[in-house]
Amino acid sequence: MSGGKYVDSEGHLYTVPIREQGNIYKPNNKAMADEMNEKQVYDAHTKEIDLVNRDPKHLNDDVVKIDFEDVIAEPEGTHSFDGIWKASFTTFTVTKYWFYRLLSALFGIPMALIWGIYFAILSFLHIWAVVPCIKSFLIEIQCISRVYSIYVHTFCDPLFEAIGKIFSNVRINLQKEI
């Protein structure tokens, strides 16, 4: 241990002292998680993406599945030439496919940037503004709820109990006259 350098039991060199359970920068999370049957935390930034199934949560199942048959249909008795129908199908499908790719290439990254900033702002506001305001409100309202509870038990409970006793002896007899 010379020059502010520390060595752990496995021979690794550190610039900060190592505690038995790990330091705050490099805790023994994996070993501790195995012992305590806890989940390991994975970094969201290093997560691999699936290039085949790009909608694993099926967000756009009912919205964007627009095929040729969903847009253009010829009823019985009103058919165009078969060649025209096939060419229309091919034109529609290829145009939709390549125009989507063109729009994605031009606007995909800027839109991802905009939505990333937007959801970062939403997350920031939720974490640093909304939740603390709600917690603060709940703490402050607790005092008011105690005063309100005392008021109800002191004034309202006896009043409504007395009114209930007054009307408890009221009997209604309904008869049907012919």
UniProtKB/Swiss-Prot annotation:
<dbReference type="GO" id="GO:0005901">
    <property type="term" value="C:caveola"/>
</dbReference>
<dbReference type="GO" id="GO:0051480">
    <property type="term" value="P:regulation of cytosolic calcium ion concentration"/>
</dbReference>
<feature type="modified residue" description="Phosphotyrosine">
    <location>
        <position position="6"/>
    </location>
</feature>
<comment type="subunit">
    <text>Homooligomer. Interacts with GLIPR2. Interacts with NOSTRIN. Interacts with SNAP25 and STX1A. Interacts (via the N-terminus) with DPP4; the interaction is direct. Interacts with CTNNB1, CDH1 and JUP. Interacts with PACSIN2; this interaction induces membrane tubulation. Interacts with SLC7A9. Interacts with BMX and BTK. Interacts with TGFBR1. Interacts with CAVIN3 (via leucine-zipper domain) in a cholesterol-sensitive manner. Interacts with CAVIN1. Interacts with EHD2 in a cholesterol-dependent manner.</text>
</comment>
<feature type="region of interest" description="Interaction with CAVIN3">
    <location>
        <begin position="82"/>
        <end position="94"/>
    </location>
</feature>
<feature type="cross-link" description="Glycyl lysine isopeptide (Lys-Gly) (interchain with G-Cter in ubiquitin)">
    <location>
        <position position="26"/>
    </location>
</feature>
<feature type="lipid moiety-binding region" description="S-palmitoyl cysteine">
    <location>
        <position position="133"/>
    </location>
</feature>
<feature type="modified residue" description="Phosphoserine">
    <location>
        <position position="9"/>
    </location>
</feature>
<feature type="cross-link" description="Glycyl lysine isopeptide (Lys-Gly) (interchain with G-Cter in ubiquitin)">
    <location>
        <position position="47"/>
    </location>
</feature>
<keyword id="KW-0832">Ubl conjugation</keyword>
<feature type="cross-link" description="Glycyl lysine isopeptide (Lys-Gly) (interchain with G-Cter in ubiquitin); alternate">
    <location>
        <position position="5"/>
    </location>
</feature>
<dbReference type="GO" id="GO:0031623">
    <property type="term" value="P:receptor internalization"/>
</dbReference>
<feature type="lipid moiety-binding region" description="S-palmitoyl cysteine">
    <location>
        <position position="156"/>
    </location>
</feature>
<dbReference type="GO" id="GO:0000139">
    <property type="term" value="C:Golgi membrane"/>
</dbReference>
<feature type="cross-link" description="Glycyl lysine isopeptide (Lys-Gly) (interchain with G-Cter in ubiquitin)">
    <location>
        <position position="39"/>
    </location>
</feature>
<feature type="lipid moiety-binding region" description="S-palmitoyl cysteine">
    <location>
        <position position="143"/>
    </location>
</feature>
<keyword id="KW-0597">Phosphoprotein</keyword>
<keyword id="KW-0449">Lipoprotein</keyword>
<protein>
    <recommendedName>
        <fullName>Caveolin-1</fullName>
    </recommendedName>
</protein>
<dbReference type="InterPro" id="IPR018361">
    <property type="entry name" value="Caveolin_CS"/>
</dbReference>
<feature type="modified residue" description="N-acetylserine">
    <location>
        <position position="2"/>
    </location>
</feature>
<keyword id="KW-0333">Golgi apparatus</keyword>
<dbReference type="GO" id="GO:0005768">
    <property type="term" value="C:endosome"/>
</dbReference>
<feature type="region of interest" description="Interacts with SPRY1, SPRY2, SPRY3 and SPRY4">
    <location>
        <begin position="167"/>
        <end position="178"/>
    </location>
</feature>
<dbReference type="Pfam" id="PF01146">
    <property type="entry name" value="Caveolin"/>
</dbReference>
<feature type="cross-link" description="Glycyl lysine isopeptide (Lys-Gly) (interchain with G-Cter in ubiquitin)">
    <location>
        <position position="30"/>
    </location>
</feature>
<feature type="topological domain" description="Cytoplasmic">
    <location>
        <begin position="126"/>
        <end position="178"/>
    </location>
</feature>
<comment type="similarity">
    <text>Belongs to the caveolin family.</text>
</comment>
<dbReference type="GO" id="GO:0030154">
    <property type="term" value="P:cell differentiation"/>
</dbReference>
<dbReference type="GO" id="GO:0045121">
    <property type="term" value="C:membrane raft"/>
</dbReference>
<comment type="function">
    <text>May act as a scaffolding protein within caveolar membranes. Forms a stable heterooligomeric complex with CAV2 that targets to lipid rafts and drives caveolae formation. Mediates the recruitment of CAVIN proteins (CAVIN1/2/3/4) to the caveolae. Interacts directly with G-protein alpha subunits and can functionally regulate their activity. Involved in the costimulatory signal essential for T-cell receptor (TCR)-mediated T-cell activation. Its binding to DPP4 induces T-cell proliferation and NF-kappa-B activation in a T-cell receptor/CD3-dependent manner.</text>
</comment>
<keyword id="KW-0472">Membrane</keyword>
<feature type="intramembrane region" description="Helical">
    <location>
        <begin position="105"/>
        <end position="125"/>
    </location>
</feature>
<dbReference type="GO" id="GO:0031410">
    <property type="term" value="C:cytoplasmic vesicle"/>
</dbReference>
<dbReference type="GO" id="GO:0005794">
    <property type="term" value="C:Golgi apparatus"/>
</dbReference>
<keyword id="KW-1017">Isopeptide bond</keyword>
<feature type="region of interest" description="Interacts with SPRY1, SPRY2, SPRY3 and SPRY4">
    <location>
        <begin position="131"/>
        <end position="142"/>
    </location>
</feature>
<feature type="modified residue" description="N6-acetyllysine; alternate">
    <location>
        <position position="5"/>
    </location>
</feature>
<dbReference type="InterPro" id="IPR001612">
    <property type="entry name" value="Caveolin"/>
</dbReference>
<dbReference type="GO" id="GO:0019901">
    <property type="term" value="F:protein kinase binding"/>
</dbReference>
<feature type="modified residue" description="Phosphotyrosine; by ABL1">
    <location>
        <position position="14"/>
    </location>
</feature>
<feature type="cross-link" description="Glycyl lysine isopeptide (Lys-Gly) (interchain with G-Cter in ubiquitin)">
    <location>
        <position position="57"/>
    </location>
</feature>
